[in-house]
Amino acid sequence: VIGQWQRKTTDNCTGEAFGEVFLAMTDNLSSKCFARTDNCTGEAFGELFLAMTDNLSSKCFAPTDNEQLTTDKFMQNQIVFITGASSGIGAACAKIFAHAGAKLILAARRWERLQQLADSLDIAADKIHLLQLDVCDRLAVESTINNLPPSWSNIDILINNAGLSRGLDKLYQGDFHDWEEMIDTNIKGLLYLTRYVVPGMVERNHGHVINIGSIAGHQTYPGGNVYCGTKAAVKAISEGLKQDLLGTPVRVTSVDPGMVETEFSQVRFHGDTERAKKVYEGVKPLTPDDVADVIFFCATRASHVNINEVILMPVDQA
């Protein structure tokens, strides 16, 4: 009960009220369970205990208005722009923000997957806007942002989620195309969206940029050379943007997960499913929903609170 409810400071929760409930509870318990009769069964005791906790929670642990504001009202009709939304963490974010009442701009290259996601969401048609967008294409990003319908142009939360990894080659044997794809998506794509969205946030004195980094931006691993470099860049860009926005109410957060079971490894190994499966052998990885929960938590703090960085990993990873 205490873990789920905040004590409400109203006349309901007085010492007298608490005492009355407690005395009634003990009277009932003593009359049923401390007399040498057949009344004191486990079932009877359980019923009394449940009744007791119901009385206590209704009188002394009612949810506060602030709690309801955070979960039910704060996100209502906030415009949330999610890149890489067609699968994985992006799709999980779409689900949790839709459930909270947000309006969603979902962007990805795979149009059919976006449509499938939209169909699966319990959300009104006027609260979702789909964009087929390659974040690596700066001119396409510029045109997309500048030509959003007026009712969608005031973006409140930007989730820079689009990203990928390619290969595990040694640096001196690396594939140039793989390097360029990682740099263009993970760094340039994030920069393009940030550059075209954040000025509006500053002008409106409201907004939140959430960049999806990685534990790879904090520690390198064999074969991760360029990918780790791109995620280290995301970490530095997030810190630099936060400094640039000091004096404004616009917030910046970097969420840096460890192993997450998505299509990430399949993409890394160019569709080699068997090789991708081996990445998670002996490990219970994070799920996209695990990461989306953390992102949603960061986005729903009080406006004066900025969570700069979150590192989350599965218990099986160190």
Language model: regions and residue ranges:
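Residue(s) in the substrate-gating loop at a strand-loop-helix junction
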Residues: 214
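Substrate-binding pocket helix/loop in short-chain dehydrogenase/reductase
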Residues: 169-171, 175-183
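Conserved glycine-rich cofactor-binding loop
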Residues: 86-87
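C-terminal helical subdomain
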Residues: 250, 254-255, 274-318
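Conserved glycine-rich Rossmann-like NAD(P)H-binding loop of the short-chain dehydrogenase/reductase
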Residues: 102-116
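The beta1-alpha1 cofactor-binding region of Rossmann-like NAD(H)/NADP(H)-dependent oxidoreductases
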Residues: 132-143, 176
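Active-site helix of classical SDR
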Residues: 194, 230
